[in-house]
């Protein structure tokens, strides 16, 4: 066991601003550290030994010899590098020690807290000490920056006076001297903004210090210059002034003459400009300064005698840099502090002289200077020399050319909005002017063609041609270039064209190559237009006429640019051959200016109007193409489902044909049979999973082969007026059509691939208008496909989808969401209505007369009713038989979850003679073959209709939970299939091979085998629920009783009634329960007084009549029963109110707990009879409260049915949610585990470790072992096996996750009992079926039609949702079994796996893994941070970069006087750094504390800060370093041999001064249209 014995001390730094303390005690004691234990566990012993005043939680340990802080969570052995040199003898007999002191974060927090909360002298003392604190501890600066200390300084400084600001600036300067501090300032833009704000202060010292800090900031790194520009722009924009206004106020000497401030300000400008990498930013800054008048300030100081030499030098640097950037060849080379910005010239094929600024941005001085004197030698050969330009046009043209140059191969787009179109139009005008100027700069022989080209721009030929971006980019500079030369680059960039494009005004067509179009995912879809036939493709055989004709066809080239940002500037060497000679463009006849300008304006107006019309057509085409793309994906998906259904319905058709052959021919078919036949044919139509996937709209089907729906199920989409007659006609068809529906369904499935005819735009418009008018009616009728507008946009479809989803969330579910045809809509409406009526009135029929009475439909004959019953049973049988092939392989012993039993029930009903006149099912023959069939209860007609509803395909959605991905393949339980093969004796099959790659789960077997015959009926029978079952209500505990009085008054009733919050608040059925109509009764005080007085009067009379000692009330019930009822009445409204609430199903009067309470009080027949007899025997004696309440309840007809139905209604939403949400979680959890890569990494690592430890080669292991992994520990470090697995996974798979956050659904599933969930689902079905019986019983008595209709809709909705839940449950359980096979569980043990336990094992293991992984990553990150921290820990900015004391010598330094001066200055700087560094090195690299020196030794201690002179020495050294840095920045650097270039992103830009240097004459200003504009004033 290794140990380390050393001296320990503590430093009392509980007050971070007190920097005068020394380590204590002076004679340090020894403490022995164990190297194998974490230091945090040994810290308490050190704290107790030293009796330190610190809080134990705030302490840390620091090494005295290098000031490094030790990691308390690591051991000394792990920090061996930090202890290097710790035990070495210093040579003076003094040993190093470990210092116990306050943690950095605690000290920084205390500093910031004191700065925020102090004021007056305390704040002044704290700010004054701040610089010394940073000098004492080099680690404090880094922690201060991380803890948002800079924000604290800015906040305090913004509210303080100039003295406090000076203290803050001193501290900030100390921070910036450290590399860590400088990096913090770089990342904190608010600090730079605040420093620039202080430049505008009225106090000289504040301004001077702020300028010095900004100079140090800019000088530190060239990348800091753009940061300063951003800060300046942000501050001045917020103030509403132009950028750099504070600097210009100093240069204009508004507050008096201060040469030092002038030098600092101008140096800051030059250093900022020198660090800019691109030309645009350079000119933006320069132009702002020029607008603020720096040219006048510069000239005043340059021409004034006696100007300070340093200031004069800075102004000269600015002027030289500006002229050099403008391309002035006479300018001197820029000093090394400046560089040439890189230019991506477009003429790379020409000579160097031609490339030097051919298409480049110039300053504002430069441009107007050339316009003023066109005969003077321009800087650039291609600089414009005709006064047809506005100064802003120069920049706009440059911007266009550069954008076209960078984005020449990007897709063509349209502007986003009308504002962009107007901007594009303005840009077009500017481009046109630029083009005319370019044309006039050519020799005289080319002037006439150029002039004539102005008239031809509006011709049909030129209108029909659209130049691509790359061609349009060259057109402004194609002065005298011949046609073939100009078309050669186009031939390289554009694909060959079969011919010229058609005019955009022709009928738009979609190219067949639309699938190959580029798509930019980050751009809005409506920005893309792919008009292949509208895009012109230039050919080589077009001569000069073609170029002249298309000269001005590039007006909209800017609108063609993609909105996607450019990846960067790119040179285009292919442009070289397309430019004319520079010498040819220097002179131009100025007489064509007026006529050319006017003609161009006229042609531009016509061109703009034409282009606006073309944009509208293009936008329409864009929308159509995007919808085509949307519908194409939808159609591909639907086609696969149609093909799958087609196979299924082929088998259905065969069954139908056999049934019709065996069916008695004399059977007459009623209208109801036709309705059900229509409903039977519905499944042949595609069933869209959501309203968004509807039948494709007519105009979105252009040029696309769209499969149509069956003609018998969907009629063509015509105007909305034709829908209703078709509905009636289809509904009224007779027996002939009904007998053909089954065959037509198959024929319709075969005809699905016929293309749908396109509709003309006029028809689409009328259809869209009519459909919008009928939108509400269509949604109310639940017509999903043909009711959607065929020309609606994508946004409209999404809005309709949202609306339909809201309706679905409120419980208005409908099976007609699966239908797409008019016939289907009609059949669905009739079927839904008939379903509710049959569920209300259906029962075991005995005679025709009873049927007519019970149904309440005197108009229906006995033959019609019997036909409907026969056809209903036949449909149920056919649908069950159609699913028998796949059902036969997925039947499991689920009990009540088996929702198909129509075949057996129908056969039993037939054998009992009940279906004497009905159809004979072919399954009756197979019934005879099954011996010993156990007798079963007969199903009622409602059960058949329930089965029919279950057999219809529907959308698997429960509220907002989507189960649509549970397909029919999930109906197959792989366990049943495997059990069939496992009957033979033998060992169980091996598990899946490995988890390394996490392969997908195995496909369900026997998919390609022949479907087996239908299973005998006794195996398909489902439980019969024909009597109400006990609901087993549990007593839900309440809070404090709402009523404290014994008297039952109306006032107590009003206090009880309050809105009952149940899950479905948005349910449409709840809107009728508004208690506002009862408010007049509540506020009618006179009636309240009257009612109260009458009761009091009666009570007094009753007491008087009891004078003879007889009983005052009739008591019939026993005391226990009576007391229970009286106690229950204390929390219920008055009995009369209860009766009204029960009759009206008023949930505002009675909540769920009240209904449950009343259910326990329902009077029995015996109690009712006794109460009535006692009341008849003593009519004058009042009943007791309990007896009166029971008598009131007994007066309510069908009380038990009402209460149970009401309880089911109020409890359904919660129960459904409790069933559906766990199922959804389990489904998502299976997907999460299947697709989780981290789980695969963990299992593979664990498998490899186990194989090694066991000496085996196992392929897999049961996942139940995962719960034991954290318990296994190694024998050396006692760390768990999970820790080692986690470490290996993190090292080998850095992109792995923590697993726990990715399997949230599994964690939620671990808390669910799925056995109880299955029981709840069965109980939901039982209660729903019993509720139909309850509603039927209630409907026999007096019941409001609206209430009956609403309850019927609710129960129908619940039935559909329960059926969906059963299907979802079965499929999810089957999927879970497949998943267990996929995870390696042996098949024979899968049935015994408990879902809850399995999920809990995975979840708990994932939680343990996440905790362990965080600890491993934390340790790893600490080590990485420590290594990174040591790179800059305590490092000064003078040790690196420009400020380093030693810099490599340049290979070829110019010799001379300037070089000698620079060398002398360099040596001086090195001397300053060497003399100042020892003081700082003694203060900063070593522990920043003060120690006592031993006078007897006569030698200086290493703790040099113990002397009284050290603070001033340190401050002077730090200030001297800062001054030297600023001084070196203000002095002129040596010239650079190779100037650096700035990146140019826009062409032909010059500085503002060059553009406006000499001004304009009034005639030139009027010719350019500049009169009254800001350009003339500039």
Swiss-Prot record:
Q: Which residues carry this modification: Phosphoserine?
A: 345, 376, 921
Q: Name one GO molecular function term.
A: actin binding
Specify residue ranges for compositional bias: Basic residues.
Answer: 1420-1434, 1541-1556
Residue ranges annotated for the FH1 domain, each copy included? 985-1016
Stretches for region Disordered: 324-518, 535-824, 915-942, 979-1013, 1418-1462, 1490-1514, 1528-1565
Question: Residue ranges of the FH2 domain?
Answer: 1039-1435
Q: Where is the composition biased (Acidic residues)?
A: 399-425, 751-761
Q: Which Pfam families match?
A: FH2 (PF02181), FH3_FHOD1-3 (PF24959), Formin_GBD_N (PF18382)
Keywords associated with the record: Actin-binding, Coiled coil, Cytoplasm, Cytoskeleton, Phosphoprotein
Composition-biased stretches, type Pro residues, lie in 985-1013
Residues in a coiled coil are 597-645
Which GO BP terms apply?
Answer: actin filament network formation; cardiac myofibril assembly; negative regulation of actin filament polymerization; sarcomere organization
Instruction: Specify where it is mainly localized.
Output: cytoplasm
Q: Which residues carry this modification: Phosphothreonine?
A: 413, 933
Q: Give compartment(s).
A: Cytoplasm, Cytoskeleton; Cytoplasm, Myofibril, Sarcomere, Z line
How would you summarize where this protein is expressed among tissues? Expressed in the heart, including left ventricle, kidney, brain and skeletal muscle, including soleus and tibialis anterior (at protein level).
What segments bear the compositional bias annotation Low complexity?
434-446, 553-583, 675-684, 692-701, 784-793, 1444-1456
- Compositional bias, Basic and acidic residues, is annotated for 599-651, 762-782, 795-809
Return the InterPro entries for the record. Answer: ARM-like, ARM-type_fold, DAD_dom, FH2_Formin, FH2_Formin_sf, FH3_FHOD1-3-like, FHOD1_GBD_N, GBD/FH3_dom
Polar residues composition-biased segments: 368-383, 453-473, 584-598
Q: How does the record describe its quaternary structure?
A: Interacts with nestin/NES-based interfilament (IF). Interacts with SQSTM1.
Which family does this protein fall into? Belongs to the formin homology family.
Give the protein's biological function: May play a role in actin filament polymerization in cardiomyocytes. Actin-organizing protein that may cause stress fiber formation together with cell elongation.
Q: What is this protein called?
A: FH1/FH2 domain-containing protein 3
């Amino acid at each position: 066991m290794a140990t380390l014995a050393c001296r320990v001390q503590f430093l009392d730094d509980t007050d971070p601003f007190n920097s005068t303390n020394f380590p204590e005690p002076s004679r340090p004691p020894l403490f022995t550290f164990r190297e194998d234990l974490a230091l945090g566990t040994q810290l308490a012993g050190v704290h107790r030994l030293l009796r330190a005043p610190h809080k134990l939680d705030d302490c840390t340990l620091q090494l005295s010899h290098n000031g490094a802080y030790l990691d308390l969570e690591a051991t000394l052995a792990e920090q061996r590098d930090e202890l290097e040199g710790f035990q070495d003898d210093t040579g003076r007999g003094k040993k190093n020690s470990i210092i116990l002191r306050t943690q950095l974060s605690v000290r920084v927090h205390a500093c910031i807290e004191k700065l925020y909360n102090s004021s007056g002298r305390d704040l002044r003392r704290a700010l004054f000490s701040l610089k010394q604190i940073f000098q004492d501890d080099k680690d404090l600066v880094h922690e201060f920056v991380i803890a948002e200390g800079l924000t604290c300084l800015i906040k305090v400084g913004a509210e303080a006076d100039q003295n406090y600001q000076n203290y803050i600036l001193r501290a900030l300067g100390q921070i910036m001297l450290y590399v860590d501090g400088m990096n913090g300032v770089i990342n904190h833009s608010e600090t730079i903004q605040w420093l620039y704000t202080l430049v505008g202060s009225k106090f000289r010292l504040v301004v001077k210090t702020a300028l010095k800090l900004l100079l140090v900031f800019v000088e530190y790194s060239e990348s800091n210059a753009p940061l300063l520009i951003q800060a300046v722009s942000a501050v001045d924009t917020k103030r509403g002034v132009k950028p750099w206004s504070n600097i210009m106020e100093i240069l204009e000497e508004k507050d008096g003459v201060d040469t030092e401030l002038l030098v600092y300000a101008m140096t800051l400008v030059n250093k900022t400009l020198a660090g800019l990498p691109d030309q645009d930013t350079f000119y933006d800054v320069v132009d702002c300064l020029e607008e603020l008048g720096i040219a006048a300030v510069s000239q005043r100081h340059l021409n004034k005698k006696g100007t300070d030499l340093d200031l004069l030098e800075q102004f000269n640097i600015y002027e030289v840099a500006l002229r050099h950037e403008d391309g002035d060849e006479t300018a001197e080379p820029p000093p090394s502090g400046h560089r040439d910005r890189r230019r991506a010239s477009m003429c790379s094929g020409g000579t160097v002289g031609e490339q030097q600024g051919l298409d480049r941005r110039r300053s504002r001085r430069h441009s107007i200077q050339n316009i003023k004197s066109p005969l003077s030698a321009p800087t650039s050969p291609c600089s414009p020399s005709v006064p047809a330009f506005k100064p802003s046009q120069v920049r706009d043209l440059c911007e266009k050319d550069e954008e076209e140059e960078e984005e020449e191969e990007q897709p063509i787009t349209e502007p986003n909005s009308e504002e962009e179109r107007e901007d594009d139009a303005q840009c077009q005008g500017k481009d046109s002017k630029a083009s005319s100027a370019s044309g006039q700069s050519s020799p005289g022989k080319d002037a006439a063609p150029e002039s004539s080209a102005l008239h031809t721009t509006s011709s049909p030929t030129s209108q029909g041609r659209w130049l691509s971006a790359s061609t349009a980019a060259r057109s402004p500079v194609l002065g005298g270039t011949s046609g073939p030369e100009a078309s050669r680059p186009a031939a390289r960039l554009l694909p060959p064209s079969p011919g010229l494009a058609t005019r955009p005004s022709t009928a738009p067509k979609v190219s067949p190559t639309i699938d190959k179009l580029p798509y930019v995912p980050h751009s809005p879809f409506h920005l893309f237009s792919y008009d292949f036939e509208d895009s012109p493709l230039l050919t080589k055989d077009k001569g000069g006429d073609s170029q002249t004709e298309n000269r001005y066809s590039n007006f909209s080239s800017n609108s063609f640019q993609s909105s996607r940002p450019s990846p960067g500037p790119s040179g285009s060497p292919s442009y070289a051959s397309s430019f004319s000679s520079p010498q040819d463009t220097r002179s131009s006849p100025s007489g064509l200016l007026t006529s050319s300008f006017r003609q161009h304006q006229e042609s531009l107006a016509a061109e703009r109007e034409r282009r606006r019309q073309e944009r509208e057509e293009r936008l329409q085409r864009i929308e159509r193409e995007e919808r085509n793309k949307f519908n194409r994906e939808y159609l591909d998906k639907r086609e696969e489902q149609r093909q799958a259904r087609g196979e299924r319905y082929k088998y259905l058709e065969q069954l139908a044909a056999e049934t019709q052959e065996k069916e008695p021919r004399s059977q007459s078919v009623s209208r109801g049979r036709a309705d059900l036949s229509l409903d039977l044919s519905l499944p042949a139509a595609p069933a869209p999973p959501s309203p968004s996937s509807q039948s494709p709209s007519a105009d979105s089907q252009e040029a696309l082969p769209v499969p149509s729906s069956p003609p018998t199920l969907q009629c063509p989409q015509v105007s909305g007026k034709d829908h209703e007659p078709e509905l009636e006609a289809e509904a009224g068809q007779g027996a002939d059509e009904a007998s053909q529906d089954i065959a037509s369904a198959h024929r319709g499935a075969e005809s699905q691939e016929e293309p749908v005819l396109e509709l003309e735009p006029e028809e689409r418009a009328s259809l869209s208008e009519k459909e919008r008018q009928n939108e509400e009616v269509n949604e109310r009728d639940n017509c999903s496909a043909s009711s959607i507008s065929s020309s609606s946009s994508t946004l409209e479809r999404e809005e309709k989808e949202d609306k339909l989803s809201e309706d679905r969330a409120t419980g208005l579910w409908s099976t007609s969401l699966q239908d797409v045809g008019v016939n289907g809509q009609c059949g669905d409406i009739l079927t839904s209505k008939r379903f509710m009526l049959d569920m209300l009135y259906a029962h075991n029929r005995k005679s025709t007369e009873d049927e007519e009475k019970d149904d309440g439909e005197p108009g229906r004959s006995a033959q019609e009713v019997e036909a409907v019953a026969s056809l209903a049973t036949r449909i149920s049988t056919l649908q069950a038989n159609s699913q028998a092939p796949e059902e036969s392989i997925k039947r499991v012993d689920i009990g009540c979850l088996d929702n198909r039993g129509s075949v057996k029930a129908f056969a039993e009903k037939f054998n009992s003679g009940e279906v004497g006149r009905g159809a004979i099912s072919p399954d009756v023959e197979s019934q005879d073959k099954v011996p010993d069939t156990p007798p079963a209860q007969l199903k009622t007609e409602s059960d058949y209709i329930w089965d029919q509803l279950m057999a219809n395909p529907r959308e698997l959605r429960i509220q907002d939970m989507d189960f649509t991905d549970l397909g029919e393949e999930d109906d197959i339980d792989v366990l049943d299939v495997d059990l069939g093969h496992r009957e033979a004796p033998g060992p169980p099959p091996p598990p899946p091979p490995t988890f390394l790659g996490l392969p997908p789960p195995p496909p369900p077997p026997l998919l390609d085998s022949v479907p087996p015959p239908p299973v005998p009926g006794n195996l398909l029978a489902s439980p019969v629920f024909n009597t109400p079952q006990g609901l087993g209500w549990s007593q839900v505990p309440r809070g404090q009783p709402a009523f404290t009085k014994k008297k039952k008054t109306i006032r107590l009733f009003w206090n009880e009634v309050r809105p009952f919050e149940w899950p479905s608040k948005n349910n449409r059925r709840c809107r009728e329960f508004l208690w506002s109509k009862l408010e007049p009764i509540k506020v009618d005080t006179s009636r309240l007084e009257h009612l109260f007085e009458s009761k009091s009067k009666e009570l007094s009379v009753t007491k008087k009549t009891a004078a003879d000692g007889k009983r005052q009330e009739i008591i019939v019930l026993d005391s226990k029963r009576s007391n229970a009822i009286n106690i229950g009445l204390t929390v219920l409204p008055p009995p009369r109110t209860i009766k009204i609430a029960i009759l009206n199903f008023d949930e505002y009067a009675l909540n769920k707990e009240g209904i449950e309470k009343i259910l326990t009080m329902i009077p029995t027949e015996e109690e009712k009879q006794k109460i009535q007899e006692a009341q008849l025997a003593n009519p004058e004696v009042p009943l007791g409260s309990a007896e009166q309440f029971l008598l009131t309840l007994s007066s309510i007809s069908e009380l038990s049915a009402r209460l149970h139905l009401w309880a089911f209604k109020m409890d359904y939403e919660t129960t459904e949610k409790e069933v559906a949400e766990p199922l959804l979680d389990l489904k998502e959890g299976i997907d999460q585990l299947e697709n989780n890569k981290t789980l695969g990494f963990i299992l593979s690592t664990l498998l490899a470790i186990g194989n090694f430890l066991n000496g085996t080669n196992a392929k897999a292991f049961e996942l139940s072992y995962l719960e034991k992994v954290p318990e296994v520990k190694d024998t050396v470090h006692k760390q768990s096996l999970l820790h080692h697995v986690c470490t290996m996974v993190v090292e080998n798979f850095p992109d792995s996750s923590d697993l726990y956050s990715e399997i949230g659904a599994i964690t939620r599933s671990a808390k669910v009992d799925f056995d109880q969930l299955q029981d709840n689902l069965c109980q939901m079905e039982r209660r729903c079926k019993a509720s139909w019986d309850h509603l039927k019983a209630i409907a026999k008595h007096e019941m409001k039609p609206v209430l009956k209709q609403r309850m019927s809709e609710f129960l129908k909705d619940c039935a559909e949702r329960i059926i969906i839940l059963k299907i979802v449950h079965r499929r999810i359980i089957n999927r879970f079994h497949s998943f267990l096979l996929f995870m390696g569980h042996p098949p024979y043990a899968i049935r015994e796996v408990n879902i809850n336990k399995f999920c809990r094992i995975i979840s708990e293991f994932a939680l343990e893994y996440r905790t362990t992984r965080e600890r491993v990553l934390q340790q790893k990150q600490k080590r990485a941070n420590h290594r990174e921290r040591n790179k800059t820990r305590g490092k000064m900015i003078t040790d690196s970069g420009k400020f380093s004391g030693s810099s490599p010598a340049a290979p070829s330094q110019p010799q001379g006087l300037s070089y000698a001066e620079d060398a002398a200055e360099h040596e001086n700087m090195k001397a300053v750094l060497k003399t100042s560094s020892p003081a700082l090195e003694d203060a900063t690299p070593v522990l920043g504390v003060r120690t006592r020196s031993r006078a007897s030794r006569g030698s200086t201690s290493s703790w040099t800060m113990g002397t009284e002179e050290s603070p001033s020495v340190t401050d002077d050294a730090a200030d001297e370093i800062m001054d030297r840095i600023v001084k070196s920045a203000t002095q002129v650097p040596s010239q650079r041999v190779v100037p650096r270039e700035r990146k140019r992103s826009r062409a032909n830009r010059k500085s503002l001064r060059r553009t406006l240097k000499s001004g304009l004459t009034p005639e030139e200003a009027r010719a350019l249209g500049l009169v009254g504009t800001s350009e003339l004033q500039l």
